[in-house]
Amino acid sequence: MSNLGKSTGSRKDTKMRIRAFPMTMDEKYVNSIWDLLKNAIQEIQRKNNSGLSFEELYRNAYTMVLHKHGEKLYTGLREVVTEHLINKVREDVLNSLNNNFLQTLNQAWNDHQTAMVMIRDILMYMDRVYVQQNNVENVYNLGLIIFRDQVVRYGCIRDHLRQTLLDMIARERKGEVVDRGAIRNACQMLMILGLEGRSVYEEDFEAPFLEMSAEFFQMESQKFLAENSASVYIKKVEARINEEIERVMHCLDKSTEEPIVKVVERELISKHMKTIVEMENSGLVHMLKNGKTEDLACMYKLFSRVPNGLKTMCECMSLYLREQGKALVSEEGEGKNPVDYIQGLLDLKSRFDRFLQESFSNDRLFKQTIAGDFEYFLNLNSRSPEYLSLFIDDKLKKGVKGLTEQEVESILDKAMVLFRFMQEKDVFERYYKQHLARRLLTNKSVSDDSEKNMISKLKTECGCQFTSKLEGMFRDMSISNTTMDEFRQHLQTTGVSLGGVDLTVRVLTTGYWPTQSATPKCNIPPSPRHAFEIFRRFYLAKHSGRQLTLQHHMGSADLNATFYGAVKKEDGSEVGVGGAQVTGSNTRKHILQVSTFQMTILMLFNNREKYTFEEIQQETDIPERELVRALQSLACGKPTQRVLTKEPKSKEIESGHMFTVNDQFTSKLHRVKIQTVAAKQGESDPERKETRQKVDDDRKHEIEAAIVRIMKSRKKMQHNVLVAEVTQQLKARFLPSPVVIKKRIEGLIEREYLARTPEDRKVYTYVA
């Protein structure tokens, strides 16, 4: 020990320094300490540790390490543990291969762990100093490594352990009861022997387990498919997945759940997706046909687990949906009722919306597929825009449909879904304008609110440009009401008489309404013509510089009609006359609601009893097509609307046919609406061609306007880029074909709005 004392001549505090004196241990003494420790370790391994002083053993180990004999202690420990595990433990386990193998191995493993904890406690100082300084495994881990290499991974023990575990799981899968605890203990042991990693568990158990499982499920899938319907197969696969998850939870390491579930999914689902989906009388189509929402939900849930599962389902659903849709919109049978046509599509949409909600969890892929399919088949039939407009027309017309406003609103919302799928929105707009005009002018709208509500839906969908004309029609109706009030006031003030005609005039703005520039001719009878002339003079006096052109095809009239003949049955006996106003013995009075053309024809019969087709044509000057349609309505319609008779009694109207008033006409209704033939069936082919021509003319202007707009802002553009941009701008209204766009570009070049560049004829410049 160093001397202690004060230093003189220094004011610093003195520090005491203690230097350890060198202690040397001779080899003999070291060996005696090691023998003592070795004996103690062996006693612990033999479970004879009750007489040992752990404090003394710790001190001895401490002394060895302190005097730099840590390596001797570490090496000695490894040899003692190895010797015990090879000579005693391994032999015991080998002897138990055919008898209580897992229990023996588990017991040996538990004993070894207990022993290593005690040994670790004795050699704690070595762990802290020697192990740290020399970067070797600590005492406990060293024990694990030796147990792993000398016992668990020893040739036949390793193979037998693997095979035993696999056999037990295979037996359990077949329904036998096995010792789950033994499997769990073995798996936990393999995980611990991996020292923070999974390699031992993975190599010695998991990899072969997954391989065996794949083979098992491969065979099981064949059996399941051969014996079960799609829905039962799906339920069995679900049960199998749950069973495997439950087995992992109780027996294996939790990290095995994901790989084993993937194996089940691959073998039972992925490899057989098409087979399951296309199963005859039980697959996806069968489920869709029979509305099996729960089975579809099970299939969706199962297929969502695997790559391309939902895609496979979607493709199959899409084929079926397109087939159904094509059948609904097929152009066969021209006599299709537009209301039934659209209702059929709405019913189909409702069915698939239900599947989407209840079976497919509102999945985006299914949603997009259904929308794409509806867009595909709805646009296969060129009449779809007209039929949709007629469907809405039917719902917005007055009539006994027994629908509340909320129900009408709901139907219109559904109709708007179909409208979104429609590529030719401009064609729909043209028809909608015609049908709205008819409702407004004949006062047939169920309510202004419903009409405006529908227009606001269209506005939300397509913007105000789309609905500006429709809104203009409403403004015209409002202004016309005011004008008529003023006109009636004028008649009262001036005392001018309209000669018994109750006249209502609607002044329509050209451009808003489906007016015709070349208005069909029609010789209006004198009394209504005289009444209109009085209105014309009144209106033009107020609005100088305006022009009024009568739109005969849009007008209507209420005619007082008197029928004089007795109404007879086929046997000649007379019958009652229902709702007619009877004056005199057989005279019946009705109010006939007719078109302007029908009024002009009927009023001829105030002058003569009979007219031939040619005579009517000459007198009225109505164009032949309109005349034929009007006469068909009056003479060939339902018996309750047949106010004229014709000879011969055929459905066709031809020259030489003779027409007379049907004096036997009767109806239960006092007010009789004469339906225009085929109004509900949509336009005839010539009319449709005419409408299509008008649409094409409008499109030319819209395409040119879009080209000019784009070129004005870009100045210079390549042909394909310009075509793509024009298509993008116009697709909300219609899809212009590249050929038509090219023609319009050429037209603009001719008119010098655009020019080709000299270096590249496919590049255009804007000519200011």
UniProtKB/Swiss-Prot annotation:
Probable core component of cullin-based SCF-like E3 ubiquitin-protein ligase complexes which mediate the ubiquitination and subsequent proteasomal degradation of target proteins. The E3 ubiquitin-protein ligase activity of the complex is dependent on the neddylation of the cullin subunit. Involved in ER-Golgi transport by regulating the size of COPII coats, thereby playing a key role in collagen export, which is required for embryonic stem (ES) cells division. May play a role in the regulation of mittotic entry via ubiquitination of aurka. Belongs to the cullin family. Neddylated. Attachment of NEDD8 is required for the E3 ubiquitin-protein ligase activity of the SCF-like complex. It is found in: Nucleus. This is Cullin-3-B. GO terms for biological process: cell migration; COPII vesicle coating; embryonic cleavage; endoplasmic reticulum to Golgi vesicle-mediated transport; integrin-mediated signaling pathway; mitotic metaphase chromosome alignment; negative regulation of Rho protein signal transduction; positive regulation of mitotic cell cycle phase transition. It comes from the Eukaryota. GO terms for cellular component: centrosome; Cul3-RING ubiquitin ligase complex; cytoplasm; mitotic spindle; nucleus; polar microtubule; spindle pole. Signal peptide: none annotated. Disulfide bonds: none annotated. Pathway: Protein modification; protein ubiquitination. SUPFAM superfamilies: Cullin homology domain, Cullin repeat-like, Winged helix' DNA-binding domain. Its main location: nucleus. InterPro entries: Cullin, Cullin_CS, Cullin_homology, Cullin_homology_sf, Cullin_N, Cullin_neddylation_domain, Cullin_repeat-like_dom_sf, WH-like_DNA-bd_sf. There is a cross-link at K712 (Glycyl lysine isopeptide (Lys-Gly) (interchain with G-Cter in NEDD8)). One of its GO terms (molecular function) is ubiquitin protein ligase binding. It comes from Xenopus laevis. Residues 698-760 form the Cullin neddylation domain. The keyword Cell division applies. PROSITE patterns: CULLIN_1, CULLIN_2. Keywords: Cell cycle, Cell division, ER-Golgi transport, Isopeptide bond, Mitosis, Nucleus, Transport, Ubl conjugation. Residues 677-698 are annotated as: Disordered. Residues 682-698 have a biased composition (Basic and acidic residues). Component of multiple BCR (BTB-CUL3-RBX1) E3 ubiquitin-protein ligase complexes formed of cul3, rbx1 and a variable BTB domain-containing protein acting as both, adapter to cullin and substrate recognition subunit. Interacts with btbd6. The lineage of its organism: Eukaryota, Metazoa, Chordata, Craniata, Vertebrata.
